[in-house]
């Protein structure tokens, strides 16, 4: 099979799966700077609250969109999972940090995503997010550029509660 034909087949499956995922993705509420969703796939559902940053620095660095999530996946017994994508491949073994005021949480990265190091800290970070007006995510690209994304917490509690309720 030719390379061109292989690329065509791969592209078809990627597009089909993306379109299929969009059909199964439903917004269940917009709350100021946050939104809650339900994703249904293969009889399982994932509920999550998500937001995009209100400030991304440095401005001139080219990268894909950033997103901050709190997810619930009942089939996998996952609750309160905080994750983030900064729109780039994170630098291997470089720290990723979530900060609000004097509170700071360590995250580990794999590829384009990062998660809280200790799952017990997910709940602590969520409590911080409920009380905060802003959360900063500081990370490093695989090329060594440091980024800081600022997320508004306006609407977080309602979006979080909606996501949690829909997957309980």
Each language-model region and where it sits:
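Positively charged n-region of N-terminal signal peptides that target proteins for export
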Residues: 1-5
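Sec-dependent N-terminal signal peptides
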Residues: 6-16
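A generic "folded-domain core" signal
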Residues: 21-168
């Amino acid at each position: 099979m030719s390379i061109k034909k292989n690329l065509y087949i791969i592209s078809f499956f990627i597009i089909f799966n993306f379109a299929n995922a969009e059909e199964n993705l439903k917004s269940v509420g917009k709350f100021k700077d946050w939104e809650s969703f339900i994703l249904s796939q293969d009889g399982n559902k994932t509920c999550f609250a998500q937001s995009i940053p209100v400030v991304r620095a440095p401005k001139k660095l080219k990268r894909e969109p950033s997103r901050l999530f709190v997810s619930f996946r009942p089939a996998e017994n996952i609750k309160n999972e905080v994750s983030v994508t900064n729109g780039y491949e994170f630098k291997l073994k470089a720290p990723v940090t979530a900060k609000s005021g004097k509170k700071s949480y360590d995250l580990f990265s794999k590829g384009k995503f990062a998660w809280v190091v200790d799952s017990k800290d997910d709940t602590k970070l969520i409590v911080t997010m409920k009380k905060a007006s802003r959360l900063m995510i500081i990370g490093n690209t695989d090329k060594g550029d440091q980024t800081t994304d600022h997320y508004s917490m306006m609407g977080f509690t309602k979006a979080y509660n909606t996501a949690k309720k829909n997957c309980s």
